[in-house]
Amino acid sequence: MTSSSSFSRFDGRAQDQMRAVKITRGFTSNPAGSVLVEFGNTRVMCTASVELGVPRFKRDSGEGWLTAEYAMLPAATAERNRRESMAGKVKGRTHEISRLIGRSLRAAVDLSQLGENTIAIDCDVLQADGGTRTASITGAYVALADAIKVLQERGVVPGSPLLAPVAAVSVGLVDGNVCLDLPYEEDSRADVDLNVVMTEHGEFVEIQGTGEETTFTRAQLNDMLDHAEKGCRELVAAQKAALGI
């Protein structure tokens, strides 16, 4: 672990320590799956809704589809942000995160076992304090699992399309020190910022990483990935505990 004896984190955690994680199922009653996920002060509502039919490019394929949308409530941050729908344009960051969530969750489901049905994932950030996209992915997996259970109970899906759990966490270099699960105060001044998505089996789904006006070495990258792997293992354990498996 890269560490400086004089370095201390904003909230007093160890460098490889997650914030408190809480996953609450059944947060709302209308969707097939609904979860409130909390990474410290970051709180995201993740829902999974079932829609009959698939997009045109999937029609007559016999396969299902999973899509995702991400948004932040205006008061999710300290300074209110105008709703993007009212501004008439969805920001590039929002599109990027929506696509990331969709890709990550498609790695957790066998689309060939869904039939021609669509699962729509919606992640709405209620309160943002860093790690909103990683919290969204982690919570959305649990909502997805509940939605698939509903499909099975209805007899729509005879098999088990759900694959190994997928979770995500942020990791970065803060003042040259590798830190896991960055809150906003650390994320906003990190030298390097990574978002890592992994399966229960330790396989990578996606790695997003950038140097913020700096560079990083292969050794530092390996150190960050080791931290991320530890965090994802803990998150998968939290997902399974929430699902009672």
Swiss-Prot record:
EC class name: transferase
Superkingdom of source: Bacteria
GO molecular function, one term: 3'-5'-RNA exonuclease activity
GO terms, biological process: rRNA catabolic process; rRNA processing; tRNA processing
Catalytic activity line of the entry: tRNA(n+1) + phosphate = tRNA(n) + a ribonucleoside 5'-diphosphate
Keyword entries, A-Z: Nucleotidyltransferase, RNA-binding, rRNA processing, Transferase, tRNA processing, tRNA-binding
PROSITE patterns reported for this sequence: RIBONUCLEASE_PH
Record-listed E.C. numbers: 2.7.7.56
Binding residue positions for phosphate: R93, G131, T132, R133
Pfam families in the cross-refs: RNase_PH, RNase_PH_C
SUPFAM superfamilies assigned: Ribonuclease PH domain 2-like, Ribosomal protein S5 domain 2-like
Record-stated family: Belongs to the RNase PH family.
Subunit description: Homohexameric ring arranged as a trimer of dimers.
Function: Phosphorolytic 3'-5' exoribonuclease that plays an important role in tRNA 3'-end maturation. Removes nucleotide residues following the 3'-CCA terminus of tRNAs; can also add nucleotides to the ends of RNA molecules by using nucleoside diphosphates as substrates, but this may not be physiologically important. Probably plays a role in initiation of 16S rRNA degradation (leading to ribosome degradation) during starvation.
HAMAP family referenced in this protein's UniProt entry, alphabetically: RNase_PH
Protein name (Swiss-Prot/TrEMBL): Ribonuclease PH
Gene that produces this protein: rph
